[in-house]
Amino acid sequence: MKFSKMHSLGNDFVIVNNIDKKNNISPIFIKKLSDRYTGIGFDQLILIEFFCKKYFYFKIKIFNSDSSESFQCINGIRCVFMFLKIKKLIKKNIAFIGNNLGLSKTLMTKNKLICVKIKPPRFYIEKDILVNPKYNNKEKIILRIFKKKITCYFVFVGNPHCIIISKNIEYNNFSLLSKYLLKNNIFPNKINISIMNILDFDLIKLKVYERGSGETQSCGSAAAAAAAVAIYYKKLNKKIKVNFSRGNLYVYWEKIGNFMSIIGPANHIYDGKINF
């Protein structure tokens, strides 16, 4: 199987052109492949499954490192776009990339960053995510965890997110907190969890724990969700810089109800080939 290793601010991917359907990849193989010591290592594996040349439409499948399927990955879409450019599968600076749940208009900016446009964020999580009926269709809930009250803001940006606002972005127990939230039947189908520190009216800092992959270096959909919370609840500017440990993403949301743009880099690391 031929593949390309790519990343966006350290959020790394293995991307496979599977349009000819030659690669029948099993969950066991995905887990083996994702191992950073005995495999290739990645946060997500992305298969390009279908291509409509007339409309520049590419259908993809996204798998987390634990082999569970993901239905949104903005950093991944950005890397797929760069893959398509490198492999000369597209000539223009625009493509529509997504799955059966929807497409994202993706384009190259003048300064060689990649912009992904997504549907308007939705400020609640549906009942299949939350186990307790009193939490269903809520915009936010307050939980008491480790003797502290924590406000969880819910946002759906193609996948579900829980955003926690804290001044202590380097919270040492972030991984412990995330695992607690995921294992204590609050979110039976799991959820992406982020801690956000608001630094200015146009700047936030983010730490992310992705469902199916664990703590990652960056996450495009988390950046979108956190920016949505910052704009909607805290009245931040419509253009926000989202800082991760390895760099920045930029989120632009003109107004509530409009599509949202997430802008950032995508980098090719190497090409390879591996046997099943």
Curated annotation (Swiss-Prot):
Positions annotated as active site in the UniProt record: 73 (proton donor), 219 (proton acceptor)
Keyword presence, Transmembrane helix: no
UniProt GO cellular component terms: cytosol
Site feature (Important for dimerization) residues: 270
Keyword field contains Amino-acid biosynthesis: yes
Organism superkingdom: Bacteria
InterPro entries in alphabetical order: DAP_epimerase_AS (IPR018510), DAP_epimerase_DapF (IPR001653)
Pathway: Amino-acid biosynthesis; L-lysine biosynthesis via DAP pathway; DL-2,6-diaminopimelate from LL-2,6-diaminopimelate: step 1/1
Example GO molecular function: diaminopimelate epimerase activity
EC numbers for this chain: 5.1.1.7
Name under which the protein is recorded: Diaminopimelate epimerase
Assembly notes: Homodimer.
List of residues binding substrate: 11, 44, 64, 74-75, 159, 192, 210-211, 220-221
PROSITE patterns: DAP_EPIMERASE
Family: Belongs to the diaminopimelate epimerase family.
PANTHER family: DIAMINOPIMELATE EPIMERASE, DIAMINOPIMELATE EPIMERASE, CHLOROPLASTIC
Subcellular locations according to the entry: Cytoplasm
Sites marked Could be important to modulate the pK values of the two catalytic cysteine residues: 161, 210
Organism listed in the record: Wigglesworthia glossinidia brevipalpis
Species classification: Bacteria, Pseudomonadati, Pseudomonadota, Gammaproteobacteria, Enterobacterales
Reaction equation(s) it catalyzes: (2S,6S)-2,6-diaminopimelate = meso-2,6-diaminopimelate
Main enzyme class: isomerase
Gene: dapF
UniProt keyword terms in alphabetical order: Amino-acid biosynthesis, Cytoplasm, Isomerase, Lysine biosynthesis
